[in-house]
Design a protein with these regions (language model features):
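Class I S-adenosyl-L-methionine
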Residues: 1-82, 104
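Polar, glycine-rich mid-to-C-terminal structural blocks
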Residues: 170-183, 192-193
Length: 294
């Protein structure tokens, strides 16, 4: 302590009621103090976006270099941070995150939220369309500038739209008790990809979970990181149930892990109870612990 006092590293107050504090210099810290104001000409950002998307597609965009600078300041201690922007606009934040990851090797992720606000632009119906297209083109641009000596960064993204549930709401009033409609509890016109996303959300599975897709009997078979399999095919007979069970077992055994494996199927996908029971028995015999249906 005496040495710190002699070096001027202890700041004392005007009297004994003020607690002494340790003096630390900026070059001794792992983070930087954020400047209250810094200036950049926003016309440069407009020119870069015009070159990327076409002239005048999105006027007065935020500067991706400025946003990257702010993100760097708050994520430098954790380059794997998740960045959220509820007003995506032209997609500047996502572009900034990809640029920053390319510059420092970070693995930051981003979530962008944008209303489908209509726009009158050639080739674009909504602002969200512009957002997605900018991310696609920025991804290609960044990849083209990467050195062959550096590991490629992940610039991919997934796009989701807010929609009603794939599962029909239950209404027990007499005028709604249509037995023919009740046979299938899933909304019409939905794809197996739609079912997969809702299943992931309901089960708490991250949407960024690695996904592989195969095919069995003409319907997709989904593999989520080897711990969750999903098959939403229809008209599943006993023979087809055995075929699906064999495909699931073979795929799981390609890279067996210690985690428990769950299988999710479409409840109304089986032609009868015998096919469903046969499928469950085949999975149990193969060592699958959990079978769920939607």
């Amino acid at each position: 302590m005496t040495e710190l006092v002699s070096e001027g590293r202890i700041r004392f107050g005007p009297n004994e009621t003020i607690r002494p504090t340790f003096k630390r210099y900026l070059d001794e810290t792992s983070t930087q103090t954020v400047l209250p104001v810094f200036y950049t000409d926003r016309r440069a950002a407009s020119k870069r976006l015009d070159a990327l998307l076409g002239k005048g597609v999105f006027p007065y965009p935020k500067d991706e270099n400025v946003i990257a600078r702010w993100i760097d300041l708050v994520t430098r201690s954790n380059p794997n941070s998740l960045v959220l922007d509820f007003f995506a606009g032209s997609g500047t934040t996502g572009h900034s995150v990809m640029n920053l990851n390319a510059a420092d090797g970070g693995k930051r992720r981003y979530i962008l939220v944008q209303l489908d606000e209509a726009v009158d632009k050639d080739g674009y119906d909504t602002i969200a369309d512009i957002t997605r297209e900018r991310l696609r083109r920025a991804s290609k641009q960044i990849a083209s500038k990467q050195s062959l000596d550096t590991a490629p960064i992940d610039t991919g993204f997934r796009s989701y739209r807010l929609a009603t549930s794939n599962i029909k709401p239950w209404d027990g009033t007499p005028d709604q008790l249509d037995l023919l409609e009740a046979v299938d509890n899933l909304a019409a016109g939905r794809t197996t990809d739609d079912l997969l996303v809702e299943m992931m959300l309901r089960m708490g599975v991250e949407l960024t979970t690695p996904l592989e897709t195969g095919e069995v009997a003409g319907s997709p078979l989904y593999n989520l990181a080897g711990t969750l399999f999903a098959y939403f095919g229809t008209n599943i007979t006993i023979d087809r149930a055995n075929e699906v069970a064999k495909a699931l077992t073979a795929w799981r055994d390609e890279d067996p892990g210690d985690a428990e494996t769950t299988v999710v199927v479409r409840d109304t996908g089986f032609v009868d109870s015998a096919a469903k029971l046969n499928f469950a028995a085949a999975l149990k015999q193969a060592g699958f612990i959990t079978l769920r249906s939607i």
